[in-house]
């Protein structure tokens, strides 16, 4: 900033003139008095020196070139299946799933998830208000990890027409979503991305990154993925030298079903350092089992991942079964209820 001052070169005195009569003389014989001419007297009165006036003069601000800073590591998306152009982080952008290629013009503010697993992922990536609606079981604290958020959110039924009425900008579906439902959404022009929900936490990392890219939440997707990987590494380090118990995940509705290979429950058992006893016995997916089948599997631990009311009845049945009395899980009291939201 340059400063210009406005100051007079010299300070000048103020001059006041006062009339002051001189002494007069009386002359004898005069018939009157002759008054002398007044003489001007000069009086100098000091004045204060003027104060400098500061006048700011605008100058141009220096222009500094700033390189754009990436808010996230773009290379994390390079090998993610489904991203059509992994170098494009602008809009529009395209992704390809089993339902084909969809193009999203801008960060979607109205997203609809048809599965609980997907809405739980989205809740970790975007503001919940960007999700158009939830279903009743999303608000069940026994089944859902977003129950509190869902309780105060718009709730709809299972009629696909209700979803269409929401006018979502994109719909996220799982591989289990009814094909007719997906077809209806696509027929009215709503983009649908069908992404897989894997059976393991680490297996879901690519899915999380794909969804994050799709909705413009790349940094959040990386942060969530990093947290999952760090937690799984911690568990792996802790369990490195531990013995691996044979764990059976079994639940009962009208019949009992064991979770074998390829199941979510089985994946959790293995990541927690156990052996999936059902898979170890040749069971794939979820298969019906009898009390005798459970005895043959001979697990060290039994977990029952279903709503508490039904779980308590089934656990009592397992504990009281004569057929199961000698298997390690029953004999050692290693039968546990697991809230459905945890798998």
Where are the language model's segments positioned?
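Extracytoplasmic substrate-binding proteins
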Residues: 84, 94, 101, 180-257, ...
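Short helix-initiation/N-cap motifs at beta->coil->alpha
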Residues: 98-99, 149-161, 282-291
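Bacterial Sec-exported substrate-binding components of ABC uptake systems
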Residues: 1-119, 219-249
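Short secondary-structure boundary segments
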Residues: 115, 175, 251, 305-309, ...
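A ligand-binding cleft/hinge motif common to bilobed small-molecule-binding domains
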Residues: 177-187, 304-319
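A short, structured surface patch at a secondary-structure boundary
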Residues: 110-175, 277
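Proline-aspartate-enriched helix->loop->beta-strand connector
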Residues: 155, 159-176, 190, 290-307
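Alpha-helical, coiled-coil/dimerization segments enriched in small aliphatic residues
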Residues: 138-140, 261-286
